[in-house]
Amino acid sequence: MKNNSILLVTIAFLAGIISGCGAKISAPSKGMSSEEYESLIRLDPQNTMMANFSAVKGMDGYFLIDNQGESTISVVDYNKGETIKKIKLSDPPGTSFKPAGNHHIFVIPGGRYAWSSQRYEKDVMWTIDLTTHEVVDTFRLSMGGKTIKAPLHIGFAYKSPLAVTGNILDKKNGYLTFLRTDTRRPSHIVELSCAGARDAMFTFDDSKVFTTCQQEPKGVSIVDVKQKKEIKWFSIEGGRAGGMTPDGKYFMVGASKAVVLIDTATNEIAKTIKVPGGGGNFTCLPDGSKCYAGLRKDNSVGVIDMASLELIKVIKTGKNGNRLYLNPANTRYGIFTNESGKSETVSVIDTQADVKIIDLETGLKPHNVAFNPEGTRAIISTPKEPVATLVDTSAADPSKWEVITTDIDSGIENNGVRWVPSPYAIKSAMNRFDSKDNQFIQIAASE
């Protein structure tokens, strides 16, 4: 039950300002200055850096699960351990696409709205109002004679109201669609030399976008944002997943038996690191000292020392090792997903000792993980079943983390998961933020 008390998170907000991470909850609007845009809170940790979960500690919230196979998004109350609502999605009138395909939730800077991206061979995306948990816009990305297929992952710019997504299922064309976060609609498309763009990310000054391409010829394309054109591309054998280091110095590529580091200043390959397996996703420690690469065929995670740019350890985990997700309240520990369709485990990793502590049993094919800001709960999607897994991660000793249930009501092909503030918390925060110059943000708390 909510109470009406107000939690002053002045320290967290000031920390956000000092670190360059925004803490203001609001929607991007036309005419915003760069300073105003940078003041918006970032709550999406996937293809964008600088997520600021410390600013929302103590805030009431929910987990959202994108149910790719049934056109719904589950709203999960992790305190009750149950789904309290399913948001219904539909395609635009007059279309005849295969239903659903809603793959992943991406929280737009400001925490007021979110997008649901697309995994099927179509160009439809949805805008979710996080104050009502309803779809407020359904739109298509194709334009100017260019057909977009499967805009899977979304990266957000840092200083300007832009976002970018690819087209992973197009085997002939490579396209990046740029969207505006102030209108929440697509802006323009840039053509690439490699097909099936996947993980697109902005440099921290918003001048360039680096993206991997999943189809042949696999590789990396670099786009000049202002000129709206590709300026370079590399062919990289087995190139698939992409990620940015916390300092923005390198764009990392998960390739065939290699991790390729591209210098974002020079646009040149800085280092190719040999690894067993390869092709998985990346997570780096917040201080940038180490990065962790999923090594799919090796059933492991590789530890890369970013000072020496060398592989320093391989930790055996489970079948089809994909990605490490760090607990935001204590980034020493994280959950690593073993994504095989026959896998029913995730591995808890100690990033200080670089060892596996325990395995936790989940549903089939654990794919994506999200923690609440306090680090006491984690949701794990399991696409091979119509349910998700909820984990108690409150123990200081991660060997005591426990599965609460593997039966959170979701849907078949449940994939992307995110933590979002509750509607009550968002409205309270927006109402009590006095002005852009006010360094005190009052956030609604609940017990």
Regions found by a protein language model. Name each.
Residues M1-L8:
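Bacterial N-terminal signal peptides that target proteins for export
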Residues V9-I17:
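Bacterial N-terminal signal peptides
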Residues G20-E447:
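Predominantly soluble domains enriched in secretory-pathway, periplasmic, or organellar proteins
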